Amino acid sequence: MNAVTDLKHDYLVADIKLADWGRKEIAIAETEMPGLMAIRDEFAASQPLKGARIAGSLHMTIQTAVLIETLKALGADVRWASCNIFSTQDHAAAAIAATGTPVFAFKGESLQEYWDFTHRIFEWADGGTPNMILDDGGDATLLLHLGAKAEKDVSVLAHPGSEEETFLFAAIKEKLAKDATFYSRNLDAIKGVTEETTTGVHRLYQMAQRGELRFPAINVNDSVTKSKFDNLYGCRESLVDGIKRATDVMIAGKVAIVAGYGDVGKGSAQALRALSAQVWVTEIDPICALQAAMEGYRVVTMDYAAEHGDIFVTCTGNYHVITHDHMAKMKDQAIVCNIGHFDNEIDIASVEKYQWEEIKPQVDHVIFPDGKKIIILAKGRLVNLGCATGHPSYVMSSSFANQTIAQIELWTEAVKGSNKYPVGVYTLPKHLDEKVARLQLKKLNAQLTELTDQQAAYIGVSKEGPYKADHYRY
């Protein structure tokens, strides 16, 4: 165990003495998070999350600290772990732990520690269970569902398909040996989950299609004020921040390969082009490929790009987008990184047999048998959080305002005993999306034009909104 913990307290962080530093940065972040702070002010008196016990699995950053304190200000009880072994900002974790909120996170966790910490968010000090999940990537949701399956048939854990699954399955077996009904007991208590990111949402839809999902879920990722802002504008700033901090390379003139041209890929490509890289895009989807081509990017295959690129960024949410053979073809000193949620976009396992030389934390040379070296950042995990500090506070305010509203929506309906959200996956209604945008605009001194009665009638909308149909593509 690398982290320092006080066993008298219900937390595990790197160094609790970092709390004062974290508190100062949290105060700055609050000034850059208008949407989230406005929601805190609006609902503090009514306490809509009173009674909610939220198990949170999301990057433990300064911005997440503001989210946690907003949830608490609205009445929730919270336990927290990071959803990535490299993404924790240790001073942020310390600042939250110092307030009495249980936090289990430090930068550079092992996979064994990661799954231990994810279990800890379900282990309430009073022996009870959480009743809500706030998830990023779906690991907390997966843990309960898979664990409950294993209670009935442990053979579901017999064949791990990756290093990650090896540690996950071992953690579940260890827990079952101590508490045979841990997962089903927690699963039965959960009223709903709000999911932050594309990868986690994909998991939720798959579970729902298979009839395995056990509670309602709100897909926060597909709120316009999340996906079109966090995914695009957030990545546009944080990708290059991570690459620069890790390598100090000049980006201008280099050939940068962006794998995937969704919202994350669009932001990543814009960032690299803004620094005068020659940006090439790989895509499977002809619509996204056409968008990239119309923006002036060269659209190629990874097989072709591998030997030409200087910088490679995966943004797909898919599996083995960069393979061993691709890396074997790359130039000496090519930089390889990922800004999708999981580390399997790059086939890291296939190059673990070679010599690795750590340059500094989260920056490694992989040395091939012929002596060629490539630079892998954050061991294939999120480069913007592994090698930098993630997205700026302002854009995370939009995402976390949506998360808070979604938690309120699911919890208040559960308390009322309504049937508004039977088991399934939902998105927030348009008027709440627009509300988040209005709250964010105030910080930018933007002035909205107001429709006249005639104009509203002409286009068939209310003067107060929503202004677009659900099928509108922003």
UniProtKB/Swiss-Prot annotation:
Its cofactor is NAD(+). Its main location: cytoplasm. Keywords: Cytoplasm, Hydrolase, NAD, One-carbon metabolism. This is Adenosylhomocysteinase. May play a key role in the regulation of the intracellular concentration of adenosylhomocysteine. Substrate binds at residues 61, 136, 196, 226, 230. It is found in: Cytoplasm. InterPro entries: Adenosylhomocyst_ase-like_sf, Adenosylhomocysteinase-like, Ado_hCys_hydrolase_NAD-bd, NAD(P)-bd_dom_sf, S-Ado-L-homoCys_hydrolase_CS. Pfam families: AdoHcyase, AdoHcyase_NAD. PANTHER family: ADENOSYLHOMOCYSTEINASE. It comes from Ralstonia pickettii (strain 12J). Belongs to the adenosylhomocysteinase family. Binds 1 NAD(+) per subunit. Pathway: Amino-acid biosynthesis; L-homocysteine biosynthesis; L-homocysteine from S-adenosyl-L-homocysteine: step 1/1. It is an enzyme of class 3 (hydrolase). SMART domains: AdoHcyase, AdoHcyase_NAD. Its EC number is 3.13.2.1. NAD(+) binds at residues 197-199, 231, 260-265, 283, 318, 339-341, 384. It comes from the Bacteria.
